[in-house]
Amino acid sequence: MKFSIIKIITKEANKDLGLLVLRVLAVFSILKTHGLPKLLNFQDSLIHIPDPLGLGATFSIYYAIFTNIFCAILVALGLATRFAAFFIITLTLSGLFIVHINDSAKVQDTPLIYSILFGFITYMGAGKYSLDYKFFKN
């Protein structure tokens, strides 16, 4: 008889493992390409970041850093996942529908993909491999 890891892992475990991998990879991507560069080049980001809602460049950069770093880390850990992912979605959707509304599909692609990823995470939750599950069993 052949040993098969596929038969050992249940469908529910596959879903939870898939959610973990999706969360970690999505967060790695947004941290690497958006969060850390904004934080490490704060002064430059302050000058160049758009202010789509007219709340001021300072608020916009702090909100972008908050969502792209703090909320992203919460999503990766699976802590307050839906809440944190929702904040990320507010940023990505404002990028898609306000900042890049007149740009080409190639430019709109990035906020669209992030919106889909974090929308899915908001809908599905963190899964079993998360701090949400450990602390709250949901």
Regions found by a protein language model. Give the residues of each.
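Extended, low-polarity transmembrane helix blocks
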Residues: 1-40, 58-66, 70, 77-138
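Perimembrane loop-to-helix junctions flanking transmembrane segments
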Residues: 45-58
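A general structural signal for well-ordered alpha-helical packing
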Residues: 46, 70-73
